[in-house]
Amino acid sequence: MTIQYTFSMIKPDAIKRNKIGQVNTYLENAGLKIVAQKMKFLTKYEAACFYDEHRARPFFNSLVEYITSGAVVLQVLKGEDAITLNRTVMGATNPAEAEAGTIRKDLGESIEANSIHGSDSENSAKREIAFFFNKSEIIE
């Protein structure tokens, strides 16, 4: 097993429903350590740059609108195989298809408003962490 860092974003739907603590409990109970965390409102420009890989997809504009509709909580998580572990704890993108006991099944409302985003690979994790955090903000 390898110690990894991964990126997580608690989305506006979960923030509006006061679920930050609940999401963090899922993450920590799974063995992930939150080593950086901050809340912010993303600008449309930041959101478009962050989700640039989806720019040509039909849902891109609605994704940018949604993710800028309220505050988000940005996080760096650390743990053994953190990327895979975080993906497992999050559950399937569509809450209706996610397994019971996952964040998206228990807290998600729809495919878009599914409460959480997480990196899907090492390259994505590195890019997404660097997009929002500098090294001095990450506590070991």
Curated annotation (Swiss-Prot):
<dbReference type="GO" id="GO:0006241">
    <property type="term" value="P:CTP biosynthetic process"/>
</dbReference>
<dbReference type="InterPro" id="IPR036850">
    <property type="entry name" value="NDK-like_dom_sf"/>
</dbReference>
<keyword id="KW-0547">Nucleotide-binding</keyword>
<feature type="binding site">
    <location>
        <position position="11"/>
    </location>
    <ligand>
        <name>ATP</name>
    </ligand>
</feature>
<dbReference type="InterPro" id="IPR023005">
    <property type="entry name" value="Nucleoside_diP_kinase_AS"/>
</dbReference>
<keyword id="KW-0460">Magnesium</keyword>
<dbReference type="GO" id="GO:0006228">
    <property type="term" value="P:UTP biosynthetic process"/>
</dbReference>
<keyword id="KW-0418">Kinase</keyword>
<keyword id="KW-0963">Cytoplasm</keyword>
<feature type="binding site">
    <location>
        <position position="59"/>
    </location>
    <ligand>
        <name>ATP</name>
    </ligand>
</feature>
<dbReference type="InterPro" id="IPR001564">
    <property type="entry name" value="Nucleoside_diP_kinase"/>
</dbReference>
<feature type="active site" description="Pros-phosphohistidine intermediate">
    <location>
        <position position="117"/>
    </location>
</feature>
<keyword id="KW-0067">ATP-binding</keyword>
<keyword id="KW-0546">Nucleotide metabolism</keyword>
<comment type="similarity">
    <text>Belongs to the NDK family.</text>
</comment>
<dbReference type="GO" id="GO:0005737">
    <property type="term" value="C:cytoplasm"/>
</dbReference>
<dbReference type="GO" id="GO:0046872">
    <property type="term" value="F:metal ion binding"/>
</dbReference>
<feature type="binding site">
    <location>
        <position position="114"/>
    </location>
    <ligand>
        <name>ATP</name>
    </ligand>
</feature>
<dbReference type="GO" id="GO:0005524">
    <property type="term" value="F:ATP binding"/>
</dbReference>
<protein>
    <recommendedName>
        <fullName>Nucleoside diphosphate kinase</fullName>
        <ecNumber>2.7.4.6</ecNumber>
    </recommendedName>
</protein>
<feature type="binding site">
    <location>
        <position position="93"/>
    </location>
    <ligand>
        <name>ATP</name>
    </ligand>
</feature>
<comment type="subunit">
    <text>Homotetramer.</text>
</comment>
<feature type="binding site">
    <location>
        <position position="104"/>
    </location>
    <ligand>
        <name>ATP</name>
    </ligand>
</feature>
<feature type="binding site">
    <location>
        <position position="87"/>
    </location>
    <ligand>
        <name>ATP</name>
    </ligand>
</feature>
<keyword id="KW-0808">Transferase</keyword>
<keyword id="KW-0479">Metal-binding</keyword>
<dbReference type="GO" id="GO:0004550">
    <property type="term" value="F:nucleoside diphosphate kinase activity"/>
</dbReference>
<dbReference type="GO" id="GO:0006183">
    <property type="term" value="P:GTP biosynthetic process"/>
</dbReference>
<dbReference type="InterPro" id="IPR034907">
    <property type="entry name" value="NDK-like_dom"/>
</dbReference>
<dbReference type="Pfam" id="PF00334">
    <property type="entry name" value="NDK"/>
</dbReference>
<keyword id="KW-0597">Phosphoprotein</keyword>
<comment type="function">
    <text>Major role in the synthesis of nucleoside triphosphates other than ATP. The ATP gamma phosphate is transferred to the NDP beta phosphate via a ping-pong mechanism, using a phosphorylated active-site intermediate.</text>
</comment>
